[in-house]
């Protein structure tokens, strides 16, 4: 990459997986009072994919990789790395890519052996919207070191389950899905030259997932559901219920900031 003596590397194939459940953007626009033309023609939004109860970042990524392997007749033992770009990791320490590899191993172990992915390097890359781009740059560099005796094959996975607060400004941009990109020498789809510009600057972004939930929000949601079911709820009942909860319950269920605010109000 980058000179006349460089090897040609790039994208050889792409596979995509979306959940079967979705919400039509016309229905969403009607529900939220949004301009459907803006969402559909302005932003190109047609539907909002929704993970089923058995789906998450790992399963969507695994399904995409499975399509890629089956369509190209790849032997898992020849796949040297699978790097995942995601903002929706399942674990704070264990890479979500390891969950993907575990599922793929279960699928292909009977044909290729229980250790078919044993020598495959996996890692998660998190950097807002460009995690998978960084994963691809790293994989391109790695594949570029291929030789005739050592043909390197890498897969870049991208998978996310984007969720925003109800009725928030970004709600209509949420959705879920995964994909897998096959990186190898002499690609059929797209050669990517070694001409890459880099610019990094710290900016504020949103943080997820939320690590705390207030007792008040839990009880309030339950009361709202009860009202929708036709129950009569007395005014101020949420606050009265919180006051009668054991102190240990409050400490375990709210963040330190919420607890201090409650103590100050009580004083």
Identify the function of each model-found stretch:
Residues 64-79, 249-259:
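Phosphate/pyrophosphate-binding loops at sites that engage ATP/ADP/AMP, CoA/4′-phosphopantetheine
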Residues 70-80, 107-121, 143-157, 266:
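Structural signature of cysteine-dependent C-C bond-forming condensing enzymes
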Residues 95-110, 140-145, 170-175:
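A glycine- and small-aliphatic-rich helix-loop capping segment at beta-alpha/alpha-beta transitions
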Residues 76-94, 100:
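Membrane helical hairpin/interfacial module
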Residues 123-151, 173-174, 181-187:
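Active-site-proximal alpha-helical scaffold in enzymes
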Residues 1-54, 171-256:
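Condensing-enzyme catalytic core mediating Claisen C-C bond formation in acyl metabolism
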Residues 258-267:
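Single conserved hydrophobic/aromatic residue that forms the stacking wall/gate
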Residues 85-91, 126-131, 158-163, 186:
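Acidic, glycine-rich active-site loops and adjacent beta-strand->loop/helix elements
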